[in-house]
Amino acid sequence: MSEEKETIKERSSGFISVRDIPGVGSSIADKLEAAGYLSAWSIVVARAEELAERTGLPVLTVQKIIENARKMLGITFKTAREVKQERLNIGKITTGSKSLDELLGGGVETKTITEFFGEYGSGKTQICHQLSVNVQLTPEKGGLNGRAVYIDTEGTFRWERIEAMARALGLDPDKVMDNIYYMRAYNSDHQIAIVDELFTFVPKNDVRLVILDSVTSHFRAEYPGREHLAERQQKLNSHLHQLMRLAEAYNVAVVVTNQVMARPDVFYGDPTTAVGGHVLAHTPGVRIQLRKSKGNKRIARVVDAPHLPEGEVVFVITEEGIRDSEEE
């Protein structure tokens, strides 16, 4: 590989300001930053129409900026070997359970959306609490040396659990809680606005994990019935793609939880399915179903992940957090 390509790869791995994009002067850069576009990567993953609307810049100007950003970052066809190398460099966060980590291919990955869905009490929120602590660990211990954003749509966040999980890992609970940015989302519009704001917030605050617990609850409550289904799915689809762009632009792990509903047409096997239909079924890179078992035991099963084999494991929820089951 040429020195020029090596330089491009090195530059694309870190934070590069929009001011470094060829053809972007100070006045245009000011408009981009005011609209929340701080890095070249945030420009690359943006839609031209959306970027023009938010900045007030002409569409043709915006298209040229996006084109220049892509050229600067060397975004073009890659060999399968280059894709492999990029995959090997993706960050992973431990769940606290070795068996669950193995099921996930080494932990919860950056640059993708991981969905945990299941019935009430299946462990979705417990995993989210654990991940928001574990992301702060060093890479040697399964973390990313980063901070977490926790978007709570149902009021299930509990600082007491964070404290207990931090102490179990020998961490200072106050320092751990200082590194978790919490926001309560009160409706779907507020939820969408929070995610939009993260394009500015994430790079400024060393955030490596974004949690949305849960992604569908507001949409489900605000758009009931078949007459609102199309509008709900369109809005949810746009929201999920914004989360995907966030994960890819800033190399963060995005974790969403989801509820389940009964399927009256299923007479054999598991009669439940995740809320959100085809829109949510196709967007997350990894989908994990959680089920209750005896006592504090929970079962996790890979439902959809292109790089993972099908399988399931048992883990437990203890006072200290997510841990391996003795059965594993």
UniProtKB/Swiss-Prot annotation:
GO terms classed as biological process: DNA recombination; DNA repair
Binding, ATP: 118-125
Source taxon at top rank: Archaea
CDD domains in the cross-refs: archRadA
Metal-binding in keyword set: no
GO molecular function, one term: ATP hydrolysis activity
SUPFAM superfamilies noted in UniProt: P-loop containing nucleoside triphosphate hydrolases, Rad51 N-terminal domain-like
Cystine residue pairs: none
Ribosomal protein as UniProt keyword: no
Entry keywords, A to Z: ATP-binding, DNA damage, DNA recombination, DNA-binding, Nucleotide-binding
Record HAMAP family: RadA_arch
Role description: Involved in DNA repair and in homologous recombination. Binds and assemble on single-stranded DNA to form a nucleoprotein filament. Hydrolyzes ATP in a ssDNA-dependent manner and promotes DNA strand exchange between homologous DNA molecules.
Protein family according to the UniProt entry: Belongs to the eukaryotic RecA-like protein family.
Name the UniProt record assigns to this protein: DNA repair and recombination protein RadA
